[in-house]
Amino acid sequence: MSYPAFDSKTFLEAHIEKTMAFYFPTCIDPEGGFFQFFKDDGSVYDPNTRHLVSSTRFIFNFAQAYLHTNIAEYKHAAVHGIQYLRQRHQSQSGGYVWLLDGGTNLDETNHCYGLAFVILAYSNALQIGLSEAEVWIEVTYDLLETHFWENKHGLYLDEISSDWKTVSPYRGQNANMHMCEALMSAFDATQNPKYLDRAKLLAKNICQKQASLSNSNEVWEHYTNDWQIDWDYNKNDPKHLFRPWGFQPGHQTEWAKLLLMLDKRSPENWYLPKAKYLFDLAYKKAWDTKKGGLHYGYAPDGTVCDPDKYFWVQAESFAAAWLLYKATKDETYYKQYLTLWEFSWNHMIDHTFGAWYRILDENNAQYDNNKSPAGKTDYHTMGACYEVLKTLTL
């Protein structure tokens, strides 16, 4: 079978364009914000429910599209999203509503994970010319500093009640990983070194300190309130949307990507070796040698505990493979980059309507025709393409 040139600027830009066309302009709700639930054919199947993660990720998508194409409609869509984020998601307490339905707030819990994407959205808003977003970044950072930052551990706690009075005992690496990503973006937008310094601290404390608590020196997902590994959290719910049990190969490779992105901004001699280690081990343990693709999760003993194939795992991994190839010139990573794309091209990408299927089973079959429920937006796939594009010469 012949494939496109997956490592070419022309291909990556065309793929982003087709993915954007799946969502835009259908996703624009003239009443405010974005529709967030799409069937395989692009039709909206829930016009009312809005999730903070989708509301912010769409802003990223449109801002990045504008920055790379200079198409004004994309900037207008990003601004449309910012207005909804500030008018509807932002609460009087200073936090952001996690889930809402029209005029009803369904879940007002304050999540660090959600606030990470608020910072990412504001950073992108600043990059497309909304100068007031620099203050919004600062205010959100200060909010996190006041309520979420645990100086003793050098990490962010995970969730707090809407009135800021009840702190969940759960601690997780996922929110800290996305805070690292968001703070790098904040640094890029503002050039304020405190954001990069914090991103570097998060990377060190998760990828070195917390990873050292696991026997394999990989990043476990779940922790107790004193940041000790909780091996049993969601053990009976391995498919939990945001907190699945097991090592997440997609998060090992996503950290590999982030470490290499940090290395570009402020080099440290441990970034590349750790990125290689996390990526190599995850790829070895999670790659389906019979049917292709990376599985979703594996147990501490290395056996696969969730054989499904998720879109974002393949996308984050091809970005990491490419950055590793660029950093090491090792052809193994180039081949893995192509292999991940070939699997995705054959099974995960909808060549009829555009965008990626969210999830496949271990036999590479779809579970349903809900391509893009809340939280997806193809932020991972397009974001991965943009990271590769940044390294390609014009």
Curated annotation (Swiss-Prot):
GO BP, one annotated term: carbohydrate metabolic process
Keywords: Isomerase
Pfam families in UniProt: GlcNAc_2-epim
Gene3D superfamilies membership: 1.50.10.10
Thermal effects: Optimum temperature is 30 degrees Celsius with D-mannose as substrate.
Reaction(s) catalysed (UniProt annotation): D-mannose = D-fructose; D-lyxose = D-xylulose
Active-site residues (renumbered): H251, H380
Stated pH dependence: Optimum pH is 7.3 with D-mannose as substrate.
The record's note on its domains: The alpha7-alpha8 and alpha11-alpha12 loops of the catalytic domain may participate in the formation of an open substrate-binding site to provide sufficient space to bind 4-OH D-mannose derivatives.
Family indicated by similarity: Belongs to the N-acylglucosamine 2-epimerase family.
Protein name (database record): D-mannose isomerase
